[in-house]
């Protein structure tokens, strides 16, 4: 089944996108549903896009939907791949199927009116080169003939009828249209301000560059025939030759050089243009840098880093001044709110004072902790000393108790002596008169035990010794309890 050919610019754009995605079978369905606006497909939301896919019968084939989405993304990001540059002209209602016979216009726009509009209102506007890039055109030089411009197949019945080969038609060739893919386009150059900044930076850097020896350069060119054939003629030109700088720029370019394999439609970035300009300026100052491209590249990048920052900053400031607006990088300060930029030093001072105060409090806490620890150590030492004294007292008490008789009274000789005494002079045992529980001081207990032994051994049967011994025993009693019944 033959696919219908596009009649408008919108249909042609859709045709190219479907052709890129290998989905030309859906072209008729898109046209029948009125889907000749590619911009609508690109800006459609998820639900709207799925609805369009259902209308054209693509919703049931998700892989086809993915291919179409990828082609749409490529068309937005790099329209040069489709040989269809983006323009500000309407995407529909621009007939390319048939031109009015005998009209000196193309696409409904007069050449003179285009020149006026391109010079006054839209200086960057490019006429779409649909016919020049998508059709096979056969034009005669100075002859009047009818040519056929086939969009896809020469045998197709729908042909675009050609016209007289006028000067206006010749001006629509790809070389004269100034397409974005042309590396010699006027936009592939820095503006005057940026070039001036590069020149100033190179002037400052020039005294620091090492001086090249011309004899070494000639020796290098003599040994390298290929390099000599390429740039040898530049060293033979005089400085007054107007073509010397042009040749230097041609062979000093780092990016997008005439012999580089750069993809069609890819523009040079601001960084690349700056590096190329810096390399050209450096080679003008020192022609020998043409033979040392690695060193030239490093120097050009150094210049680019400095120039790009300064020029971009200055341009932004100038644009903001022209619009009488605040810089996008400046913090907007509302009325009634403090200036936080001015309060930063104050906040810093306050934070510093707080840190010093916290440090002082920390030292005080450390001192208090040390004092507390010393108090605890002293208390512990006193407690240990008290425990030691208590243990000593208990030991002395146990020692004094062990030295006494097993029944708790006086020694056995005392009892024996009492047995020899008359009945009327006998006294009850100390055990019968001494309570069970009493507390005795260590030293007095020891004194009591020694005195008791001496009295019991020296005054057996003597009555006068009893009161003294009884007095001594009465002094030792602290707590009186009933006698033991045993």
Curated annotation (Swiss-Prot):
Where do we see the Glycyl lysine isopeptide (Lys-Gly) (interchain with G-Cter in SUMO1) cross-link in this protein? 332, 479
Q: Where is this region: NCD2?
A: 220-309
Where it sits in the cell: the answer is:
Nucleus
| GO cellular component: a single term | nucleus
User: Where's it mainly located?
Assistant: nucleus
Region NCD1: what ranges?
Answer: 4-82
Q: Which biological processes are named by the entry's GO terms?
A: endochondral ossification; myelination; negative regulation of DNA-templated transcription; regulation of DNA-templated transcription; regulation of epidermis development; Schwann cell differentiation
Using the UniProt annotation, give all residue ranges assigned to the region (Necessary for nuclear localization).
Answer: 306-337
- Region entry Disordered, spans: 160-187, 398-438
Where expressed (tissue)?
A: Widely expressed in adult. In day 16 embryo highest levels in forebrain, thymus, salivary gland and cartilage.
Please report any disulfide bonds recorded for this protein chain, giving both cysteine positions: none
User: Cross-link Glycyl lysine isopeptide (Lys-Gly) (interchain with G-Cter in SUMO2) maps to which residues of the chain?
Assistant: 126, 129, 143, 211, 332, 354, 368, 372, 453, 464, 476, 479
Quick one: signal sequence residues? none
Where is this chain compositionally biased, Low complexity type?
404-417
Outcome following mutation: residue 33 to R: Loss of transcriptional repression
Q: Which UniProt keywords apply?
A: Isopeptide bond, Nucleus, Phosphoprotein, Repressor, Transcription, Transcription regulation, Ubl conjugation
Which GO terms label this protein's molecular function in UniProt?
transcription coregulator activity
Q: Identify the InterPro entries for this entry.
A: Nab1_C, NAB_co-repressor_dom, NAB_fam, Nab_N, NCD2_sf
Query: Which residues does the record list as Phosphoserine (modified residue)?
Result: 171, 182, 327, 405
The family annotation for this protein states: Belongs to the NAB family.
> What is this protein for, i.e. what is its function?
Acts as a transcriptional repressor for zinc finger transcription factors EGR1 and EGR2.
Q: What is known of its domains?
A: The NAB conserved domain 1 (NCD1) interacts with EGR1 inhibitory domain and mediates multimerization.
Q: How does it assemble?
A: Homomultimers may associate with EGR1 bound to DNA.
- This chain's protein is named NGFI-A-binding protein 1
């Amino acid at each position: 089944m033959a696919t219908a050919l596009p009649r408008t610019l919108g249909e042609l754009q859709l045709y190219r996108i479907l052709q890129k995605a290998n989905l030309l079978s859906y072209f008729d369905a898109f046209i029948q549903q009125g889907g000749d606006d590619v911009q609508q497909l690109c800006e459609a939301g998820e639900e709207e896009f799925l609805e369009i896919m259902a209308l054209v019968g693509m919703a049931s084939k998700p892989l086809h939907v993915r291919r179409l989405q990828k082609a749409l993304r490529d068309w937005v990001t790099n329209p040069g791949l489709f040989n269809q540059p983006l323009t500000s002209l309407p995407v529909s209602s621009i007939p390319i199927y048939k031109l009015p016979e005998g009209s000196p216009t193309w696409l409904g726009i007069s050449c003179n009116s285009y020149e006026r509009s391109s010079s006054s209102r839209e200086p960057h506007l490019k006429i779409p080169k649909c016919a020049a890039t998508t059709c096979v055109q056969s034009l005669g030089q100075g002859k009047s003939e009818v040519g056929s411009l086939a969009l896809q197949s020469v045998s197709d019945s729908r042909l675009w009828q050609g016209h007289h080969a006028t000067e206006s038609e010749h001006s629509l060739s790809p070389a004269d249209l100034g397409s974005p893919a042309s590396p010699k386009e006027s936009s592939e150059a820095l503006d005057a301000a940026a070039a001036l900044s590069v020149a100033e930076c190179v002037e400052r850097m020039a005294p620091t560059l090492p001086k090249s020896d011309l004899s070494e350069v000639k020796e290098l060119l003599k040994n390298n025939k290929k390099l000599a054939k390429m740039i040898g003629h530049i060293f033979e030109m005089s400085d007054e030759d107007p073509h010397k700088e042009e040749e230097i720029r041609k062979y000093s370019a780092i990016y997008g050089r005439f012999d580089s394999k750069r993809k069609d439609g890819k523009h040079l970035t601001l960084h690349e243009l700056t590096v190329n300009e810096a390399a050209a300026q450096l080679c003008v100052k020192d022609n020998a840098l043409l033979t040392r491209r690695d060193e030239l590249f490093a120097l050009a990048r150094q210049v680019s880093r400095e120039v790009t920052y300064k020029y971009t900053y200055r341009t932004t400031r100038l644009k903001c001044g022209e619009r009488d607006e605040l810089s996008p990088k400046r913090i907007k300060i509302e009325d009634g709110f403090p200036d936080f930029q001015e309060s930063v030093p104050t906040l810093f001072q306050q934070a510093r004072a707080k840190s010093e105060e916290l440090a002082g409090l920390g030292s005080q806490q450390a001192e208090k902790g040390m004092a507390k620890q010393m108090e605890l150590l002293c208390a512990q030492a006193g407690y240990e000393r008290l425990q030691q004294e208590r243990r000593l007292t208990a030991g002395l008490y146990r020692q004094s108790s062990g030295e006494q008789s097993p029944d708790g009274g006086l020694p056995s000789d005392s009892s024996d002596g009492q047995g020899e005494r008359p009945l009327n002079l006998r006294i009850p045992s100390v055990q019968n008169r001494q309570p069970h529980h009493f507390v005795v001081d260590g030293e007095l207990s020891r004194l009591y035990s020694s005195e008791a032994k001496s009295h019991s051994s020296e005054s057996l049967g003597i009555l006068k010794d009893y009161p003294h011994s009884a007095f001594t025993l009465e002094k030792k009693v602290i707590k009186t309890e009933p006698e033991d019944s045993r």
